[in-house]
């Protein structure tokens, strides 16, 4: 098995390369907050020498309640992304939910994300593939790791091989997620880069009746476990005031803890990738 390397400017995304951080905020709440959060991430990752991609959503189209905040929408969201990219010289990742969003989003962001709930929607997959952008596929909570090959094949047949696979937890009864650590290793056997969404994996879907609950007190433990697998990247969301975040605050890392948190993740990644592989199948 060979590890596919995805090149994003000077950043190399691969399972055997230093991990890349995909981080930011859950949803764009305001231009000023997005700029402030991006600045913090940029400063911390530059200080620690961690390759970094800024993440945020312009529309949370799958909220539990019709009354929940969704975001500024695509037009305004792309303006904010353009300003972040220009100001901090950062690559960007965001998600799309409709086929018409793919082309205009790909003109601004570097990586387009396929949401977990939509990962089997063929028309959306094809529209995303045809942009030529790098694709981040969130593994659906209801699919086994080996079933990701069908989604990969759809992208390949539509002409796109620049694919990242993202683990974000699996359904465990009602209102709960668990993370199958062996499942991430199984996805790595595809050769494609695998990243771990350590904050969304802390969700309790529907756990607060009209919105998702979460377990951010365990954010460090879960991320440490994932990084021990030797992954291409870590996906996290942070907020300066998680209790008042407009989406997924219960899962968000407090922004002021970002530097210490990432120091630990980098130390684990450096250590694990310094080891010679051991083939215990023989």
Curated annotation (Swiss-Prot):
Q: Which HAMAP family match?
A: KDO8P_synth (MF_00056)
Q: What is its main location?
A: cytoplasm
Source domain of life is Bacteria
Q: Which reaction does it catalyse?
A: D-arabinose 5-phosphate + phosphoenolpyruvate + H2O = 3-deoxy-alpha-D-manno-2-octulosonate-8-phosphate + phosphate
Q: Name one GO cellular component term.
A: cytoplasm
GO terms of molecular function:
3-deoxy-8-phosphooctulonate synthase activity
Record-given protein name: 2-dehydro-3-deoxyphosphooctonate aldolase
Which GO annotations describe the biological process of this protein?
keto-3-deoxy-D-manno-octulosonic acid biosynthetic process
Q: E.C. number, please? A: 2.5.1.55
Q: Which family does it belong to?
A: Belongs to the KdsA family.
Annotated pathway, please?
Carbohydrate biosynthesis; 3-deoxy-D-manno-octulosonate biosynthesis; 3-deoxy-D-manno-octulosonate from D-ribulose 5-phosphate: step 2/3; Bacterial outer membrane biogenesis; lipopolysaccharide biosynthesis
What UniProt keywords apply to this chain's record, in alphabetical order? Cytoplasm, Lipopolysaccharide biosynthesis, Transferase
Class of this enzyme: transferase
Localization recorded for this chain is:
Cytoplasm
Q: Name the gene for this chain.
A: kdsA
InterPro entries in the record: Aldolase_TIM, DAHP1/KDSA, KDO8P_synthase
Give the species. Shewanella sp. (strain W3-18-1)
């Amino acid at each position: 098995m060979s590890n596919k390397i995805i090149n994003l400017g000077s950043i190399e995304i691969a399972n055997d390369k230093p991990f890349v951080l995909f981080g930011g905020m859950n949803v764009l709440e305001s231009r000023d907050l997005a700029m402030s959060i991006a600045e913090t991430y940029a400063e911390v990752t530059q200080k620690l020498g961690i390759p970094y991609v800024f993440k945020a959503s312009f529309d949370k189209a799958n909220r539990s309640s019709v009354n929940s905040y969704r975001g500024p929408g695509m037009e305004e969201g792309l303006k904010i992304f353009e300003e972040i990219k220009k100001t901090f010289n950062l690559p960007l990742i965001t998600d799309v939910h409709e086929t018409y969003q793919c082309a205009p989003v790909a003109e601004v962001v570097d990586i387009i994300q396929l949401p977990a709930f939509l990962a089997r929607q063929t028309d959306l997959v094809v529209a995303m593939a045809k942009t030529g952008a790098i694709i981040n596929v969130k593994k659906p909570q209801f699919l086994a790791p080996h079933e990701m090959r069908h989604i990969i094949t759809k992208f390949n047949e539509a002409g796109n091989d620049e694919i990242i696979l993202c683990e974000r937890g699996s359904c465990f009864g009602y209102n709960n997620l668990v993370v199958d650590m062996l499942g991430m290793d199984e996805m790595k056997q595809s050769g494609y880069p695998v990243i771990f969404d350590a904050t969304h994996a802390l969700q309790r879907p529907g756990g607060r009746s009209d919105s998702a609950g979460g377990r951010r007190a365990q954010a460090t433990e879960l991320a440490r476990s994932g990084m021990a697998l030797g992954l291409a990247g870590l996906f996290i969301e942070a907020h300066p005031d998680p209790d008042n975040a407009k989406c997924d605050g219960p899962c968000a890392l407090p922004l002021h803890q970002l530097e210490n948190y990432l120091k630990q993740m980098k130390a684990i990644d450096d250590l694990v990738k310094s080891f010679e592989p051991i083939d215990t199948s023989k």
